[in-house]
Amino acid sequence: MAEYDLTTKIAHFLDRHLVFPLLEFLSVKEIYNEKELFQGKLDLLSDTNMVDFAMDVYKNLYADKEIPHALREKRTTVVAQLKQLQAETEPIVKMFEDPETTRQMQSTRDGRMLFDHLAEKHGFRQEYLDTLYRYAKFQYECGNYSGAAEYLYFFRVLVPSTDRNALSSLWGKLASEILMQNWDAAMEDLTRLKETIDNNTVSSPLQSLQHRTWLIHWSLFVFFNHPKGRDNIIDLFLYQPQYLNAIQTMCPHILRYLTTAVITNKDVRKRRQVLKDLVKVIQQESYTYKDPITEFVECLYVNFDFDGAQKKLRECESVLVNDFFLVACLEDFIENARLFIFETFCRIHQCISISMLADKLNMTPEEAERWIVNLIRNARLDAKIDSKLGHVVMGNNAVSPYQQVIEKTKSLAFRSQMLAMNIEKKTNQNSRTEAPTWAAQDSGFY
């Protein structure tokens, strides 16, 4: 289902190395021409040092042609550069292998103290930091992400936050951990990078907006793989004004991922409250972005169009199956979406035909009855099933005036936040196209 594929939009905000997993996924799904995907990989590889990978892709794309001489020459050059950097970095690496240095790194949080210790014991010099950074970046460009992560960790521990390479080293460390699928480490790096961006007083508002936009896209890898990711994505994307503003201004397509995280969230009470806030954002941005996932929420909670919601739910399956980040959420999404339809339908109708519910839930009457029985048992819903008549009879779920007041006042802060962001959004729109992108960089993480 190429119509709803977001790979091109998302790739615009990713480092080129992070795009490769997305292209591999598309190859398996076969929704694009295979040769076009191979050509896309080759174009991405042209500005990296992964020459062997580029040669393999070239062979797949042009089986009847010889490997270009330029590629072979580039391989020779890369190997020579790697050997030279290894020789320059070897004495530095030996310092970090020293047991006493390892203990110091684990026990001290002060990079200056560690630097002074290395300078005193091993003759460590300031220029070694630049050498370490260049070697880490070169390792990354060659596809050796474990080596890059290790050296970038050493670099981060030693440099002050004001160092010219400090921020880009954080991006590189995060990318390396993502590509190695070390989700706990990636979550730590994501948090550290977010704090650095949010506390940066030097960057202009436009630069900060761009950095947050990159962070939003890179974070998708972490949030949809880490056990706590679906909670964290809601907190960051929906309830932190600067990030919600970035989504609305620069990348409204991210609403697909926020909506999926809300629908698949395992905390039922939190999910119901968050949905109300999410619906407001989806309504507000419906003129700039919509897909079956956001339209499902709109059909159900804005229009109360159950037939439309059922149709969109079927379309959601195709979208989820073909989305790199969301494919693992399919079962949770369908199960919870059916629950939402059921809950909303029950609020409107006192007595419901099981066959009608089955139709709304895209199930057989027998499946629907079993599903509702389990739902009533597990969720303790105030309802009874009349198997003889084939009806579900709802209990009295009247909301107390006290609860109504609480629900109405809960959204006041959120509405104020939305008003403030709308004003800021209008201010930023004129300069939207001027923002730099990672895709414009030559290679690597900066």
Swiss-Prot record:
SUPFAM superfamilies: Winged helix' DNA-binding domain (SSF46785)
The keyword Cytoplasm appears for this protein: yes
Location of the PCI domain: 222-399
Region Disordered, residue ranges: 425-446
BP-aspect Gene Ontology terms: formation of cytoplasmic translation initiation complex; translational initiation
GO CC term, one of those recorded: nucleus
Compartments where found: Cytoplasm; Nucleus
Protein name: Eukaryotic translation initiation factor 3 subunit E
Organism: Xenopus tropicalis
Upper classification of the organism: Eukaryota, Metazoa, Chordata, Craniata, Vertebrata
Gene of this entry: eif3e
